[in-house]
Swiss-Prot record:
Species assigned in the record: Rubrobacter xylanophilus (strain DSM 9941 / JCM 11954 / NBRC 16129 / PRD-1)
Species classification: Bacteria, Bacillati, Actinomycetota, Rubrobacteria, Rubrobacterales
Record bears the keyword Nuclease: no
Designated gene of the protein: rplD
GO molecular function: rRNA binding; structural constituent of ribosome
Stated role: One of the primary rRNA binding proteins, this protein initially binds near the 5'-end of the 23S rRNA. It is important during the early stages of 50S assembly. It makes multiple contacts with different domains of the 23S rRNA in the assembled 50S subunit and ribosome.
PANTHER family in the cross-refs: 50S RIBOSOMAL PROTEIN L4, LARGE RIBOSOMAL SUBUNIT PROTEIN UL4M
Family under the similarity heading: Belongs to the universal ribosomal protein uL4 family.
HAMAP family membership: Ribosomal_uL4_B
One GO location term (cellular component): ribonucleoprotein complex
Protein name in the entry: Large ribosomal subunit protein uL4
């Protein structure tokens, strides 16, 4: 059974905790995880790239010069895609909110649980106890990570009320600070170590113990 390393931020004590439930006992399936990552990244795209087509470019629609007798190649108007400053043929246009890759809820949950289970099996899951910052302190945040022995990149999941801790850790370049619902499969795979505060860990496991 996978275990998480528990570190007490107040006393510096270390312990281990068994990880139970579907969050940590799901077999990772690479094809499902791949689909989830692609869907997540597609959902973050804004799809706002826009180019002007021939009809949207300013300019006359008149033929530039006569068809015959000039010795030059025949040409149409100045808005032709072949000319500098002309319209773009087949260029990108803004797309609607339903555009992009989709994944159903069951697959998304299986991918998330599989990625989390893989981190737990590798021993790269940590729970941080007694994370109480009276005021933001990046120095103390860096010292805590050093005492824990974690190396970046680190994904730190905090509860929404742990504001001082979030302000302390977010200045560290190797740490990505997110809320309980602010990360997905992509962030789990990108991080070397995943650290949960005790409150964030409680939110993660709530309602999933029975599957």
């Amino acid at each position: 059974m996978a275990q998480a390393q528990v570190f007490d931020a107040r006393t510096g004590r270390r312990s281990e905790m068994e990880l139970k439930g579907p969050r940590f006992e799901t077999e990772p399936k690479q094809h499902v995880i791949h689909r989830a990552v692609v869907a997540e990244l597609e959902a973050r795209r804004r799809w706002t790239a826009s180019t002007r087509e021939r009809s949207e470019v300013a300019g006359s629609g008149a033929k530039l010069y006569r068809q015959k007798g000039t010795g030059r190649a025949r040409a149409g108007d100045i808005k032709s895609p072949l000319r500098h400053g002309g319209g773009t043929w087949g260029g990108p246009k803004p797309k609607g909110p339903r555009y992009g890759k989709k994944i159903n809820r069951k697959e998304a949950r299986a991918a998330f649980d599989g990625a989390l289970s893989a981190k737990a099996a590798e021993g790269r899951l940590y729970v941080l106890d007694a994370l109480d910052f009276e005021r933001p302190s990046t120095k103390r945040a860096k010292e805590l990570l050093g005492q824990m022995g974690v190396e970046g990149p680190v994904l730190l999941v905090l509860d929404g009320e742990e504001r001082e801790a979030a302000l302390s850790f977010r200045n560290l370049p190797e740490v990505t600070v997110v809320g309980p619902r602010g990360y997905g499969v992509y962030e789990l795979l990108r991080a070397r170590e995943v650290v949960f505060s005790r409150a964030a860990y409680g939110r993660l496991t709530a309602g999933r113990e029975e599957g």
